[in-house]
């Protein structure tokens, strides 16, 4: 964030920062000052070219709830040399990456752990990354504001339903989204593949902004999604907190956001033109990656499958030693997920687990 955005977000949340997170706030203030300065330099050097940039083609959007396999699919599609994705550096420094990435990406790599804390997936400046981080940083309008302020929640500015945003917020969000994509187009000049879990609830907005866009919806066993989402909030997004988080509130957030986003998706999926939506299961992508990708390319009428697969196969071979986290599902969790997310078990062919006995747990990875 720039200083102006950070101050605005702090004001919305009554500057309620837990004392233990004051060093984190101090870091954000210093970083905000640096972002503000570099953003001015980028505007002076590249501003006119960025404003004139045009998208090569409508974007391809990967849809799916958090921990549903969107990152894996994003990484696979990034193997296609005719496509491009936002990188981690671009998503985390959206105000100035056009200007700063030639030298800033190396500095970023020197300070990153190399792996994401919630799943050990590689994280470097050049790895594909979701654009929601960039949108949160550019305008402070994103569900990810809940990660910064888990107690106050940032009000309606963190809504997953665009219709619930405060007046003027959607237009501001759209302007910043388009600016970010113009920067990507100016930098790379290829069709952009994007992935952001909240896009599940933005179908009508995205279609209005980008007629001709393609959508890929990936689902995963809801029990695994729930358990992995808990891990995400505990060990991934927790690094962003400026307030003390209530585990019960975060648990409810995971459950309710899933229901709300899928209600919005089911309502608006009919707006997507025929031939522009492809759906798959994460489990099928894991076991039959070539078949899934080949069908995806055919259904969405995308070129270059064979070239993409040559590189994707190399990427998959490098993942040979990767081990996913294992999670244990107990009865209380099974009951909540089975009841509240029942609609997706039936729709996508996942079996409901019968009640578990006391002390019994089921393992998921």
Whereabouts are the PLM-identified features?
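PAPS-dependent sulfotransferases, especially Golgi type II membrane carbohydrate sulfotransferases
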Residues: 1-45, 50-51, 157-163, 168, ...
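N-terminal signal-anchor transmembrane helix
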Residues: 40-62, 93-95, 100-101
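Glycine-rich phosphate-binding P-loop
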Residues: 62-78
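Short His-Asn-centered micro-motif
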Residues: 63-65, 193-197, 282
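Post-Walker A helix-loop "phosphate-sensing" segment adjacent to the P-loop in P-loop NTPases
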Residues: 79-89
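PAPS-dependent sulfation machinery
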Residues: 90-192
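Flexible loop/turn segments at secondary-structure boundaries
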Residues: 200-203, 223-226, 279, 286-289
């Amino acid at each position: 964030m720039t200083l102006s955005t950070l101050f605005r977000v702090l004001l919305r949340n009554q500057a309620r920062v837990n004392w233990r997170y004051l060093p984190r706030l101090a870091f954000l203030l210093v970083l905000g000052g640096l972002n503000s300065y570099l953003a001015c330099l980028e505007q002076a050097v590249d501003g006119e070219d960025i404003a004139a940039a045009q998208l090569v083609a409508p974007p391809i959007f990967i849809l799916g709830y958090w921990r549903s396999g969107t990152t894996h699919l994003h990484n696979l599609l990034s193997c296609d040399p005719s496509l491009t994705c936002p990188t981690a550096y671009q998503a985390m420094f959206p105000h100035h990456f056009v200007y700063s990435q030639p030298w800033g990406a190396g500095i970023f790599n020197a300070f990153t752990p190399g792996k994401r804390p919630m799943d050990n997936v590689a994280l470097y400046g050049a790895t594909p990354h979701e654009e929601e981080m960039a949108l949160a940083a550019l305008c402070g309008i994103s569900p990810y504001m809940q990660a910064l302020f888990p107690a106050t929640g940032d009000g309606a500015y963190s809504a997953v339903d665009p219709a619930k945003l405060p007046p003027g917020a959607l237009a501001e969000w759209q302007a910043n989204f388009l600016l970010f994509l113009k920067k990507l187009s100016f930098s790379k000049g290829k069709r952009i593949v994007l992935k952001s879990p909240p896009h599940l609830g933005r179908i009508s907005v995205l279609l209005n902004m980008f007629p001709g866009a393609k959508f890929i919806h990936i689902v995963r066993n809801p029990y695994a999604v729930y358990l992995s989402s808990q891990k995400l909030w505990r060990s991934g997004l927790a690094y962003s907190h400026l307030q003390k988080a209530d585990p019960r509130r975060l648990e409810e957030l995971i459950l309710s956001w899933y229901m709300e986003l899928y209600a919005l998706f089911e309502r608006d999926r009919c707006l997507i033109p025929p031939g522009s939506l492809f759906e798959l299961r994460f489990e099928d992508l894991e076991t039959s990656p070539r078949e899934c990708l080949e069908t995806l390319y055919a259904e969405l009428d995308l070129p270059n499958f064979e070239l993409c697969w040559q590189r994707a196969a190399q990427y998959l071979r490098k993942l040979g030693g990767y081990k996913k986290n294992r999670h244990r599902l107990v009865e209380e969790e099974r009951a909540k997920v089975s009841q509240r997310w029942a609609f997706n078990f039936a729709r996508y062919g996942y079996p409901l687990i019968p009640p578990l006995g006391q002390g019994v747990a089921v393992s998921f990875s």
